[in-house]
From Swiss-Prot:
Disulfide bonds: none annotated. It comes from the Bacteria. Keywords: Cytoplasm, Magnesium, Metal-binding, Nucleotidyltransferase, RNA-binding, Transferase. It is found in: Cytoplasm. Its EC number is 2.7.7.8. This is Polyribonucleotide nucleotidyltransferase. Residues 691-737 are annotated as: Disordered. Residues 556-615 form the KH domain. GO terms for molecular function: 3'-5'-RNA exonuclease activity; magnesium ion binding; polyribonucleotide nucleotidyltransferase activity; RNA binding. Mg(2+) binds at D489, D495. Residues 625-693 form the S1 motif domain. Involved in mRNA degradation. Catalyzes the phosphorolysis of single-stranded polyribonucleotides processively in the 3'- to 5'-direction. GO terms for biological process: mRNA catabolic process; RNA processing.
Amino acid sequence: MAKQVFQTTFAGRELIVETGQVAKQANGSVVVRYGESTVLTAAVMSKKMATGDFFPLQVNYEEKMYAAGKFPGGFMKREGRPSTDATLTARLIDRPIRPMFAEGFRNEVQVINTVLSYDENASAPMAAMFGSSLALSISDIPFDGPIAGVQVGYVDGQIIINPSQEQAEQSLLELTVAGTKHAINMVESGAKELSEEIMLEALLKGHEAVKELIAFQEEIVAAVGKEKAEVELLHVDADLQAEIIAAYNSDLQKAVQVEEKLAREAATQTVKDQVIAVYEEKYADHEEFDRIMRDVAEILEQMEHAEVRRLITEDKVRPDGRKVDEIRPLDAVVDFLPRVHGSGLFTRGQTQALSVLTLAPMGETQIIDGLDPEYKKRFMHHYNFPQYSVGETGRYGAPGRREIGHGALGERALAQVLPSLEEFPYAIRLVAEVLESNGSSSQASICAGTLALMAGGVPIKAPVAGIAMGLISDGNNYTVLTDIQGLEDHFGDMDFKVAGTRDGITALQMDIKIQGITAEILTEALAQAKKARFEILDVIEATIPEVRPELAPTAPKIDTIKIDVDKIKIVIGKGGETIDKIIAETGVKIDIDEEGNVSIYSSDQDAINRAKEIIAGLVREAKVDEVYRAKVVRIEKFGAFVNLFDKTDALVHISEMAWTRTNNVEDLVAIGDEVDVKVIKIDEKGRVDASMKALLPRPPKPERDEKGEKSERPYRPRHHKDHKPKKEITETPKDSE
């Protein structure tokens, strides 16, 4: 295929798509240029159906450091495992694409996005999402797209599509919305306590922009799209399905309606084991034994799926007996752990999360060095999901994509209410340990995080709570569920997580298994979520009504001082010698930023005070009109040098020592004397002049007589230097001759 170029303008930036030039051996590939961001997307499908009971889709997002003109960090100077941001972007692309493949599709599909050049004002993640959909759409891979996504901001009361970096920094909203031309199918958002009405407006305007991108994709597909390949879909034998349903559907229905999770799982598994045992014996010698048993397992899954949905849509009964808008029993506990800086345990039904707070000096912040300029991340929220939380065994190790994603969602929800660095100069880490799970564990971690922050004395603006909403839809009718449990999440059509305060939403996340949802469903889900959020906040506030006024005794205390930027090198010293000496002497931790903010941390307040004194002395400057108790350190004919403090000396000129005239400095002071001086001048070179006499009483002026005239003083003739007095001649009386 020859190279073809397609071009349009979107959100004020040029959008160019190139096909037929690179990566031509992939099933589909495109180069997307948005602004000066360039992303290569290649989509590949395996030739045969994969084994397993799930669709093996893999979406990667690769950040090449050369795209931003940077070297990779570390010793190897080569890109390694994906960054957290890259992992989250890959999930962001995967989620709207996954529902667009046919039920029963089992061929492995890989979609690889490589960022080749990076423009911080033109969203590379959105270019990658666009490219992923387009590469699949023009390929022969059976994909029921296209889809597209946009970023949405909210600045000065205005909705902005794909905001620039400057606009994003000012925005009260960080929203990504994706979907088809008919409906929204993915949402990811952080927000600064925005109302449901503003969020809905942003979602709908975002979807209007999505439609523009889809129309552009359809134009390209019409020009260069391949005919879709015929692939085998996983279908079960219809006769076998009818046979199993007739024999065992009644037993499975009874098992599904057991209200308690573990008992229900045991009951359904008993029915499934019974069916499997019957058919293993029946077809033990059959040449297609593996296919038949795979069909049996799939049929049982479909039967359970159908019964859960029937109960909710027809009988309006949930598996655990709740109403559609009812929350499971709630419990909140603070101070679950001793010694730590704060802890909260939150339980909702059979979902339970423990959140643990750690406060640290700002030197513990995480340095993020990706395609954007390097920055420091002050707040971290980490989410762990051990297998024992669902009563199973499994792998243990580094967090997977799901754990990273759930941690990021909680981080966005809670970050909106954290105090500023000036108000609370700490690095903050929350770790959520999921101890039990039956759905909505990410939202439980947000509630537990609020408890831990408040118990730990972090002055958050308001408590945050989270709730997960679900959806069961048969095409014509739908039911929105509040606080979905695991079974409803697994067999339902939507997982819509909403977190916020009483004043507004701080985070949204929505994934669906159908191809989209309407504005009507979104409106209803947001309204039900608000009601549920307030109920949970009632429980949190009853447990801990206000943020504690003090930090835990084990938390590091902190004090801050501000120094001039040009004094930073004095405090640090050559090779860090000075600051290391202060730390060794006092036992504190010290952080200094590039603006001269010095943060001193210790559990011992006396140690902090001592370190502050040392630093204040190092950077102290003499000021005009200030008085100092100084020590004479050197004497010259013209005056004495005195030490004001540390390494700062001043000259007291002989004329500034006393009101009476003296010709000898040593008549007034000696080396080692301590004298009070007042600074009277500092010249442009920083040289200090001081005065002793300015602090002494001025001698009285000469007295005046009753007429107000000065009293007479002895006459002292003054002569010009060249004047010679005449010689007096005395005549001798003649009589004396």
